[in-house]
């Protein structure tokens, strides 16, 4: 059967009909695909293919639309496009003509991350000079994270092993999804406003950029920067970075490392206490040596001065010094002993019993040594004082008179008479003997 003349089409007529059918059936559609065979000739138009694992189609974006793109299309990039399905009449090729194209998936998120990071950095939000130092001793910690994730288990395990005395409050929250960022921000602001915590820890485990996106929220980054309480961010793995890391006062590569940075190891703390106790013993010995040196110098000064009144004064001073030194030393010893008892009570539940017993025996030994040393010092000083008193009595003029000698002085002016040529017949003298004074006259 032969067709009628009006039923016979030329290729151009068929392509025109097919084009009209396609354009009428698909007014404007969205397609997500991977770019391939990207070409940009001098005309400024863009030509490429849109493909997935099973198929591909040609696409074009003309210069009037392509000039407004916010990125440079490259081979392998995943994009989201909008356009019309049509047919290129000259070659009979089915294609899409696009009026919009944007990055899709992680590529779009990465670009948004870099743009927001650059803007906040320009505002000074990440300036190191703005960051607050962490306290030396963290006593109360707020942990904002998922209550069921691996991050909270890692953090609590490390904290319990290193420093079980730390008070930890878990503030549970979503860590991914559309509402996670707002919830994290509210918890952070509430924890900061309460004034109860020394540090706030934001943390979650690893994941894709999309999984971690809640921690790239602008409002959360600004809340971290405005917090009066120091904030530590430990989001994802060591290679993951989020805006919360840049805004926080300290960025930890993993949740476990964050816990290690926040608290000391109880074993290191015990070693530090033992070193402190040894230092206290050394200081006590030094104080005793200084006291003995001062006492020796006081005795030397005492031996160089002969009047009995000064001797008595120095004796009283020396005794007073001994009493005061003893009292001060006992007070210092009691304070140090109290500190050691407190340290022993704190660590009693976390250290071997033999270490506590050793510290108590050392404390008992320290109590006895200062008292014995002080007693020996006082006895030695008393012995020296008695010897000095006997020496003074031996050379005293009054002792010489008591042995039968007399001291002659002139009655008129009290001058001591040592030689015969000092007197003349008729001079009145006084003779001082052991039990009184005799008036005499020279003949």
Swiss-Prot record:
Domain of life: Bacteria
GO molecular function list: exodeoxyribonuclease VII activity; nucleic acid binding
Any one cellular-component term (Gene Ontology): exodeoxyribonuclease VII complex
Keywords assigned by UniProt, alphabetized: Cytoplasm, Exonuclease, Hydrolase, Nuclease
Catalytic activity: Exonucleolytic cleavage in either 5'- to 3'- or 3'- to 5'-direction to yield nucleoside 5'-phosphates
Keyword match NAD: no
Chief localization: cytoplasm
Enzyme class: hydrolase
Biological process per Gene Ontology, one example term: DNA catabolic process
EC number: 3.1.11.6
Compartment(s) of residence: Cytoplasm
UniProt keyword Hydrolase, yes or no: yes
CDD domains on file: ExoVII_LU_OBF (cd04489)
UniProt xrefs under HAMAP family: Exonuc_7_L
Quaternary organization: Heterooligomer composed of large and small subunits.
PANTHER family in the cross-refs: EXODEOXYRIBONUCLEASE 7 LARGE SUBUNIT
Annotated family: Belongs to the XseA family.
Function: Bidirectionally degrades single-stranded DNA into large acid-insoluble oligonucleotides, which are then degraded further into small acid-soluble oligonucleotides.
The protein's name in its UniProt record: Exodeoxyribonuclease 7 large subunit
